[in-house]
C-alpha cells in the first residue's frame, strides 16, 4: 500500500472514533463560542456558499486580522489554513539554489515545500537545555550566507513551546536584512504566549507573518488562516495562489465572529489550557525517568521526555491509543531528536487532560513491554 493511503486510513480511523481524546495535534477542543456557531449557521442558512468569496478574503476579516496582530500598515491574504499560506510562500519566494534556514525541531511541512521548490534546507539544532531549547543569535548568524533566501521561524516553537524575546526577534530580523532574506515568522501559536513580538515590526519590507485560526479559535477542520506582509509581497503571493477563488465563506464568517469575541472569550481558554499544563507537569514528575522539557509552554502543548524512562515514544503513543487518547511521537517533528519525547496538547477539556495524567504510570509500564508498533504518522 502506498504511504499516503496508509496515512489516510490511519487518520480516518482516528477521526471516526467519537470517543477519541485528541491530545496530539495541538487542536482546540474547548466548546465553540455561541456567536461563532451562529455566524456559521447564519451563513449556511443564507446559502452564501453558492458564490465564491472575495479572492483575498472578506474585507472585514482582513481588517480584523491586522488589528489582532497590530500591523496596521501591512496587507492580508486569507488562506485555506496557515499551511496553504506557507506552501504559497515557500514555493514562490524560495527556489533552486536558494538556502532555507530553520530550526530542528520545528514544523516539518515548510521544509518539504522548500525542498520541492529546489531549495537547500539548513536545520539548526536547538534541542538543548543548555541553550534553553531555543535558537541563539550566534547560531543564526553562523548559519546564513549570501545564498540564504528564507529564514523560517515558528514562534512560539512547535513542538517545544519556547517564545522569543523582542531583543531576539530584532536581532534575527537584522540578520535577515543583512543577507537580504525573507523572514517567515510563523505565529500560529502567538495567542497563547505571555509576550510576543512580530518580526514585521523590525523588518516590514521582507517579513512574512503566518496566521492561523486553527489553534486559538478551534477551527482546524474549517481550514482558515492568513498571510500578512507588505502590499507588494501580497501582490506577488496573490498572483497565483493554490486557491484563487476565495476561501470557504462559512469559515471566514466564523473567523470574523471569533475575532469580535476574542477579548472576552480567549483569556479563559488560555487559563484552562495552562491549568492542563500544570496538571500534566505534576503527573510527569511522579513517574521516574519522565520530564517536561519546557514549562510553562508558551503554546498549547508540552514536550514530555520519555527517553530516560526506558521506553520509546512510539510505544507510549501506542499504549495511550488503546485507551482512546491520541498523543504524538517526537519523530513527527524531528528525526534527529524525536526518539526523546512525545508531545501532548493542552487545549482540551479538563477531563481529557486528567485522563492522560491518571493513566500515565500504567501507560509507561505498558509501553515497556511494547517492542514493535504499527506505522505512526
Model-derived regions, located:
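Conserved glycine-rich beta-strand-loop-beta hairpin in the small C-terminal domain of fold type I
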Residues: 273-281, 293-305
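PLP-dependent aminotransferase-like
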Residues: 92-153
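Active-site phosphate-binding strand-loop segment of PLP-dependent enzymes
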Residues: 127-194
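N-terminal small-domain helix-loop-helix segment of the aminotransferase-like
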Residues: 1-84, 88, 366-367, 376-377
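A short helix->loop->beta-strand "cap" motif at the edges of active sites that frequently abuts
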Residues: 98, 119, 178-181, 205
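Conserved core segment of the aminotransferase class I/II
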Residues: 205-274, 281-282, 318, 365, ...
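Short, conserved charged micro-motifs
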Residues: 310-316, 351-355
Amino acid at each position: 500500500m502506498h504511504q499516503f493511503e496508509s496515512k489516510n486510513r490511519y487518520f480516518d480511523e482516528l477521526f471516526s472514533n467519537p470517543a477519541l481524546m485528541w491530545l496530539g495535534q495541538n487542536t482546540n477542543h474547548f466548546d465553540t463560542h455561541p456567536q461563532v456557531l451562529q455566524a456559521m449557521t447564519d451563513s449556511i442558512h443564507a446559502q452564501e456558499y453558492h458564490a465564491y468569496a472575495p479572492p483575498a478574503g472578506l474585507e472585514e476579516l482582513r481588517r480584523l486580522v491586522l488589528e489582532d496582530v497590530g500591523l496596521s500598515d501591512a496587507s492580508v491574504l486569507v488562506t485555506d489554513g496557515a499551511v496553504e499560506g506557507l506552501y504559497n510562500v515557500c514555493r514562490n519566494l524560495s527556489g533552486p539554489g536558494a538556502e532555507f534556514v530553520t530550526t530542528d525541531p520545528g514544523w516539518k511541512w515548510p521544509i518539504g515545500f522548500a525542498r520541492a521548490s529546489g531549495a537547500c534546507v539548513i536545520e539548526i539544532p536547538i534541542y538543548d537545555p543548555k541553550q534553553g531549547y531555543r535558537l541563539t543569535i550566534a547560531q543564526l548568524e553562523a548559519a546564513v550566507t549570501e545564498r540564504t533566501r528564507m529564514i523560517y521561524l515558528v514562534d512560539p516553537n512547535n513542538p517545544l513551546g519556547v517564545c522569543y524575546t523582542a531583543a531576539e526577534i530584532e536581532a534575527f530580523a537584522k540578520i535577515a536584512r543583512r543577507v537580504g532574506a525573507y523572514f517567515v515568522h510563523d505565529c500560529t501559536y502567538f495567542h497563547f504566549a505571555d509576550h510576543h513580538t512580530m518580526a514585521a515590526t523590525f523588518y516590514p519590507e521582507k517579513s512574512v507573518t503566518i496566521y492561523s485560526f486553527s489553534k486559538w479559535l478551534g477551527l482546524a477542520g474549517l481550514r482558515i488562516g492568513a498571510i500578512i506582509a507588505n502590499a507588494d509581497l501580497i501582490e506577488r503571493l496573490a498572483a497565483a495562489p493554490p486557491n484563487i477563488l476565495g476561501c470557504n465563506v462559512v469559515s471566514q464568517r466564523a473567523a470574523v465572529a471569533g475575532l469580535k469575541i476574542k477579548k472576552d472569550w480567549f483569556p479563559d481558554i488560555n487559563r484552562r489550557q495552562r491549568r492542563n499544563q500544570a496538571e500534566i507537569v505534576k503527573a510527569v514528575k511522579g513517574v521516574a525517568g519522565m520530564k517536561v522539557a519546557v514549562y510553562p509552554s508558551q503554546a498549547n502543548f508540552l514536550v514530555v521526555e520519555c527517553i530516560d524512562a526506558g521506553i520509546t515514544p512510539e510505544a507510549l503513543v501506542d499504549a495511550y491509543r488503546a485507551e482512546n487518547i491520541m498523543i504524538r511521537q517526537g519523530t513527527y517533528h524531528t528525526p534527529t531528536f524525536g526518539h526523546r519525547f512525545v508531545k501532548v496538547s493542552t487545549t482540551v477539556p479538563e477531563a481529557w487532560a486528567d485522563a492522560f495524567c491518571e493513566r500515565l504510570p500504567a501507560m509507561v509500564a505498558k509501553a515497556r513491554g511494547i517492542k514493535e508498533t504499527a506505522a505512526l504518522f
